[in-house]
């Protein structure tokens, strides 16, 4: 076999190997959600992606499918780097300007909500990957119209809570207190969690109603999160400053795709190498 043909064959093999590696899916990152007051996405996920109960959650699935709910802990911008207000336009705050989560921006008054009152409030954030950073929580100003898309100018300039997060979380939660100002009617609590070990940031909208005695919207149970883990497309494998992969959430099926692709490349390489050797001997 000529050297030219050998080189050509190796070139094809290299291209095939590169293609296999390129087609390997890259898991998205996900790191938690507000459970008290429960965020929009967490509340709809708790109802069940396949059979949601409230009309707004049914409409979300009809519009965007079930995957956004199975990926309830992923509403993020990978390279926010403290520039959230520049990267997220008005009307897209709840989705972090991501089309996958566009339904979260719907200006509706039937989102699952939590009744609140002015004064101290105990926030509860479910962590699926703990990070060092700052969680800043805002509330809409008095006079906010929940039938209109949320704008940055709708948020009170003074946060209701600021919490320094660490790389450890007690029982899988960040628990911290804040102070809710006097308000009436329906409002949105908006959370920005900016990491300081990475440019990544996370966002959520929670609907609250002052003076409401209605039972608060439920947050997902631990049993549900564990059972639904195989449906998730998210993972937390040491990216963006994580020295070790957190173990709070079981790995998703997508985690196994890279080893499979590498095995396929190895097999293809071995087969092609054997074929080239055989041809050279015959030549």
Stretches found by the model and what they are:
Residues 200-222:
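Short beta-strand elements
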Residues 1-30, 260-280:
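Secretory targeting and sorting signals
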Residues 29-135, 139-145:
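N-terminal "mature-chain" segments and other terminal, solvent-exposed stretches
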Residues 142-172, 238:
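Exoplasmic/lumenal beta-rich domain surfaces
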Residues 127, 174-183:
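Short, hydrophobic beta-strand segments
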Residues 222-277, 282:
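Extracellular Ser/Thr-rich, low-complexity/disordered mucin-like segments
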Residues 183-198:
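Internal, hydrophobic beta-strand segments that form the core of beta-sheet-rich folds
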């Amino acid at each position: 076999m000529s050297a030219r043909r050998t080189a050509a064959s190796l070139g094809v093999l290299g291209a095939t190997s590169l293609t296999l590696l390129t087609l390997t899916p890259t898991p998205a990152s996900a790191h938690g959600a507000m459970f008290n007051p429960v965020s929009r996405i967490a509340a709809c996920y708790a109802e069940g992606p396949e059979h949601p109960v409230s009309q707004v959650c049914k409409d979300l699935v009809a519009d965007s499918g079930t995957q956004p709910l199975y990926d309830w802990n992923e509403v993020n911008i990978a390279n926010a780097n403290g520039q959230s207000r520049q990267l997220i336009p008005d009307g897209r705050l709840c989705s972090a300007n991501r089309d996958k989560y566009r339904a979260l921006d719907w200006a509706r008054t039937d989102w699952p909500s939590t009744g609140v009152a002015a004064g101290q409030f105990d926030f509860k954030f479910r962590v699926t990957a703990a990070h060092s950073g700052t969680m800043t929580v805002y509330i809409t100003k008095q006079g906010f119209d929940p039938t209109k898309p949320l704008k940055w100018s709708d948020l009170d300039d003074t946060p209701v809570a600021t919490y320094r997060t660490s790389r450890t979380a007690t029982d899988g939660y960040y628990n911290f207190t804040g102070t809710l100002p006097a308000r009436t009617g329906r409002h949105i609590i908006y959370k920005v969690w900016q990491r300081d070990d990475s440019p990544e940031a996370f966002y959520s909208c929670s609907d609250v109603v002052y003076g409401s005695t209605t039972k608060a919207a439920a947050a997902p149970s631990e049993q549900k999160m564990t059972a639904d883990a195989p449906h998730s497309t998210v993972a937390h494998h040491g990216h963006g400053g994580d020295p070790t992969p957190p173990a709070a959430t079981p790995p998703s099926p997508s985690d196994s795709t890279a080893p499979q692709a590498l095995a396929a490349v190895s097999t293809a390489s071995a087969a092609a190498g054997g074929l080239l050797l055989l041809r050279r001997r015959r030549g």
